[in-house]
């Protein structure tokens, strides 16, 4: 018989220790991976609720199981809040991840073998935008576009490729691009050749929700996002549209269920509903503005210290530090910073001579440190520490000093106070 007093600590101490160790790691490390963030205790409360027990195949009011009257309320709240947050007329909150949301869009708009124009992974795109190792690159004819010598998206090249190859779908969005995307220009190009415009705004959804980054929803036929990253919700995906096309909406819903998934994760959808409500609060806009301010402050210090930033700056939450020409790989930089309790990820940069497993760059983002309460002063100080480590990546005394400074700073700014 189940009892509410049951707990992991007593029953499975080995697992409990791993959970506790990860909790301590998050508190004592500075998180700079651009796709990571700290979700709220309210979201975690929803995810740990008895909603996890409920199967609810279908959609609100149209379920294949009984007993769904309350989970219908939960999902409807999430849908309506997502629509309000992004100015959409359609929202599907069931995708288990951003990649599965993207898969549903491909399934809706394309047939295998159709031509797609997507951002080159090496220039800042995403696996699901046409990488050969991903379903998108295996099932569709991918034409990649990229960035110019200034590190900005080359819209002239994009238009030339679109006219030449006539893709059925164009993809906007990225995983490692620090600029502002001109969604309107992309829609113009798509309309010129009669293509769908699909935007994956996973990385900037929180910035978009707060009005500090242009909203793609009015321009694209379909938009997807994750619900974590800058949005700071549970790990999951969403699909949005303002196309006012009921036939498209039905096809998108069918592509999620039954096309790609079975039962939705109702406890996660509840977490999404909470996160969307939090994102509608005025303080969320203040937070997102600070995310960008902190990123710009970090870029200034990197440039002062002689480091190259891809595109020369940032207009969002992330930056790519280009290490080409330095006696340091992205993998080595990642490891050295990790030893100092600073978590980043190695990342390929444009024209990278090294493999994706080694790389010549690191990607840095500010959503998590800003969530902890860091302002410009802390962001600048932290960046100097990062440069100290990168300048002395094999000097254990420098790494030890920086680790001590990191621990002191983390103690001043706990993740969950």
UniProtKB/Swiss-Prot annotation:
The cofactors named for this UniProt entry are: pyridoxal 5'-phosphate
Q: Where is this site: Plays an important role in substrate specificity?
A: 228
**What's a BP term from Gene Ontology annotated to this protein?**
glycine biosynthetic process from serine
CDD domains assigned: SHMT
Entry keywords, A to Z: Amino-acid biosynthesis, Cytoplasm, One-carbon metabolism, Pyridoxal phosphate, Transferase
Q: Matching PROSITE patterns, A to Z?
A: SHMT (PS00096)
One GO cellular component from the entry?
cytosol
The pathway to which it is assigned is: One-carbon metabolism; tetrahydrofolate interconversion; Amino-acid biosynthesis; glycine biosynthesis; glycine from L-serine: step 1/1
EC number(s) reported in the record: 2.1.2.1
Q: Which residues bind (6S)-5,6,7,8-tetrahydrofolate?
A: 121, 125-127, 355-357
Entry's Pfam families? SHMT
Which reactions fall under this protein's catalytic activity?
(6R)-5,10-methylene-5,6,7,8-tetrahydrofolate + glycine + H2O = (6S)-5,6,7,8-tetrahydrofolate + L-serine
Q: Where in the cell is it found?
A: Cytoplasm
So which domain of life are we looking at?
Bacteria
N6-(pyridoxal phosphate)lysine (modified residue): where? 229
Does this UniProt record's set of keywords contain Cytoplasm?
yes
Please give the Gene Ontology molecular function terms for this protein.
glycine hydroxymethyltransferase activity; pyridoxal phosphate binding
* Quaternary structure and partners: Homodimer.
Entry function = Catalyzes the reversible interconversion of serine and glycine with tetrahydrofolate (THF) serving as the one-carbon carrier. This reaction serves as the major source of one-carbon groups required for the biosynthesis of purines, thymidylate, methionine, and other important biomolecules. Also exhibits THF-independent aldolase activity toward beta-hydroxyamino acids, producing glycine and aldehydes, via a retro-aldol mechanism.
Q: Of which family is this protein a member? A: Belongs to the SHMT family.
Mind telling me what this protein is named?
Serine hydroxymethyltransferase
């Amino acid at each position: 018989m189940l009892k509410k007093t049951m707990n992991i600590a007593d029953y499975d101490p080995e697992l409990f220790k791993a959970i506790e160790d990860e909790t301590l790691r998050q508190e004592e490390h500075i998180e700079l991976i651009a796709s990571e963030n700290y979700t709220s205790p309210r979201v975690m409360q929803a995810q740990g609720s008895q909603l996890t027990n409920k199967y609810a195949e279908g959609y609100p009011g149209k379920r294949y199981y009984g007993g769904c009257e309350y989970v219908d309320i939960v999902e409807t709240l999430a849908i309506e809040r997502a629509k309000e947050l992004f100015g959409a007329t359609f929202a599907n909150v069931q995708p288990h991840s951003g990649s599965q949301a993207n898969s549903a869009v491909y399934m809706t708009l394309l047939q295998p073998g159709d031509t797609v124009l997507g951002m080159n992974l090496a220039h800042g795109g995403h696996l699901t935008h046409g990488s050969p190792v991903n379903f998108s690159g295996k099932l569709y004819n991918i034409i990649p576009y990229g960035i110019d010598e200034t590190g900005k998206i080359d819209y002239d090249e994009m238009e030339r490729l679109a006219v030449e190859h006539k893709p059925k779908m164009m993809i906007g969005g990225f995983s490692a691009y620090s600029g502002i995307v001109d969604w309107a220009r992309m829609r113009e190009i798509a309309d010129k050749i009669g293509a769908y415009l699909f935007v994956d705004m996973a990385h900037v959804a929180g910035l978009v929700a707060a009005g500090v980054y242009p909203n793609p929803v009015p321009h694209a036929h379909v938009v997807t996002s994750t619900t974590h990253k800058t949005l700071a919700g549970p790990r999951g995906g969403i699909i949005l549209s303002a196309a006012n096309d009921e036939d498209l909406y039905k096809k998108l819903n069918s592509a999620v269920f039954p096309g790609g998934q079975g039962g939705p994760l109702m406890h996660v959808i509840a977490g999404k509903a909470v996160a969307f409500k939090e994102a509608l609060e005025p303080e969320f806009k203040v937070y997102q503005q600070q995310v960008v301010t902190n990123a710009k402050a970090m870029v200034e210090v990197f440039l002062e210290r002689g480091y190259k930033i891809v595109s020369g700056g940032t207009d969002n939450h992330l930056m790519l530090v280009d290490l080409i020409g330095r006696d340091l790989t992205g993998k080595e930089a990642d490891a050295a910073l990790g030893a100092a309790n600073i978590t980043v990820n190695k990342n390929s940069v444009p024209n990278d001579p090294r493999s994706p497993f080694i790389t010549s760059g690191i990607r840095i983002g500010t959503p998590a440190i800003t969530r902890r309460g860091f302002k410009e002063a802390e962001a600048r100080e932290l960046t100097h520490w990062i440069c100290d480590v990168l300048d002395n990546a094999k000097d254990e005394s420098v790494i030890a000093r920086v680790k001590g400074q990191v621990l002191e700073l983390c103690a001043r700014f706990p993740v969950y106070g």
